[in-house]
C-alpha cells in the first residue's frame, strides 16, 4: 500500500521531533542521530538499521508514543555507534543479537538514571538489559555477554529468562519448538525489538565502518 504524501510528511515530522528531543535530553545520542538518514520500509515489521539508514515499518511507527520512539531511536543508533552491525559475523546470530540488545538497552537505561520506563514498550514490556550473571549489560561488551549466554545454555538460562522477562510480555506469541542451540532462549529472544538481518549484508572493509571509529 502506497503511503500518501501527507502520511510521509507526518512520519518525517515525528522523526525530526524525536531527534530534537533526544538532542536536548541525551546530547550524546542526539549528535549521533544527526549523522543518520531515515526511511520507511513496509516489509520490515518493526525497525532496522544497516549502519547508514534507520528504517521504520510505518505500522510499527504508528504504534509508538513519543517516549517509545525516542527509546527506539537511541537503541538503533547505539547499535551503529558500538559497531554491532560490523561485529559478530562469525557468531551464532540469534545469541549475538540478544547480547547486543542487552548491552544497548542497559546503556540507554544508564543514560536515563536507571529509570526502566525509558526502555519499556507498551507492547513488549521492559526491554532486556541484564547480563546472565544478573549484572547490568553496560558493564560488558556484546561479545562478553554472548559468551555468558553460551555458558548459560542448559545451565542457568531458566533463571536468566525469568529475570529478564519479569516485566515483558513478548511480541510474537506461540510455543514452537526448535532444534537450534538457542532453543532454550527462544522465549527470551522474542523480546528483541528490532530487525538485525541487515547486519549480515555489511562488509567489514567498508568506509561506513570508519565513520564510527
Stretches with model-predicted labels:
Residues 107-213:
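Negatively charged
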Residues 1-69, 73, 77-114:
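Basic/hydrophobic alpha-helical interface regions
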